[in-house]
Amino acid sequence: MHYHIILTTKCNSQCKYCYEKSMNDFDADIEKKAKLDLSSPESSKIDVNALKKFIAKDKNPVIIFYGGEPLLQINKIKEIMNNIDVPYRMQTNGKLLDKLPIKYLNRIDKILVSIDGDKETTDRNRGKGTYDLVMNNISLIKENSYSGEIIARMTLSIESPDIYDQVLHLISIGFSSIHWQIDAGFYGYDYDKEKFSLFVKEYNNSIAKLIDFWMNSIRNKKVLKLYPFLGIVNSLLNNEKSSLRCGAGHSGYAIRTDGKLVACPIMSWVEDFISGDLNSEPKNLKRFPIAERCNNCQIKYICGGRCLYWSYLKLWPEKGNELICNTIKDRKSVV
């Protein structure tokens, strides 16, 4: 099982898709859609010995440091790593990557770094100077012999549908592992049918070009880890039925700052998705199936249901959700 440990809800960035949108969405009556639990503290108060006992009950645990920005809690990271010997991963904005000593970094076998493509796109989404700072820090940890996998974690905004150009830029500067997600359906106020319809058309065309590029790379015996493609291809080749690909609520959970476990870190405040606590048995944590809205979909087990948070809260109208689904159906048909 994978466990995202939310070390803090604080962040040292104010990204447009996260901070800015959350401020605009504050009065969107979200409490009418879900029962909220906002009781957990800002920074992690979990007892490391209790965490160690819980993790020991799992045969194949992986800990993922998460936030907010996890590197704002470097001492907590060190405390956990000094006491628990398991595989580690981390999702970070990369601004403080140079602050964690290399002996700890090298025990983190995958680091997902938030970067959206070229300098203009990244700085527009995440603030001026972000791109240069993040790339400098990545260079520093490589120079210090970081031996793990660095994954570019992109957020694709409606203003930037050309995933092809942005992914090729990241490849050109040294990334061979890339993941992305469309910023769509996560806030109640930002749906614009005309703009998003145009985005989907341009995005799907760009994805088709990117798949052609990826397949040509494979033919030339170079397999780029474009994770959204890898998952679909693996399912098609192995006739595999996939649940939510992120693992939320079946093979992955988040540990809140108060020690409660939830199905997914981005819904840590939704009471319905509290699944247990550090006294629970991992095998007995509450599980969440693919959403009912997906039951009659022909690619249900290829897509896996896209996102538990999105399908549960239904913040966009159904027309908007259908457009989101079309981006996945189009990707599957091209592959």
Give residue spans per PLM region.
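Cysteine-centered iron-sulfur cluster-binding motifs in ferredoxin-type domains/subunits
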Residues: L7-Q14, E69, G249, C294, ...
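Short cysteine/histidine-rich metal-coordination sites, predominantly Zn2+-binding motifs
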Residues: E31-L36, W310-N326
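Radical SAM/AdoMet-radical enzyme domain recognition
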Residues: V48-I64, Q73-D183, D192, F196-L198
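Conserved small/polar residues in nucleotide/adenosyl-binding loops
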Residues: V334-V335
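Canonical Radical SAM [4Fe-4S] cluster-binding loop centered on the CxxxCxxC motif
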Residues: M1-I46
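C-terminal accessory region of radical SAM enzymes
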Residues: K201-L236, L261-Y309, L313
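Cys/His-rich metal-chelating microdomains
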Residues: K10, Q14, C18-K21, M267, ...
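Radical SAM enzyme [4Fe-4S]-AdoMet core and its adjacent flexible, acidic
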Residues: D27-D29, K35, K128-M135, S139, ...
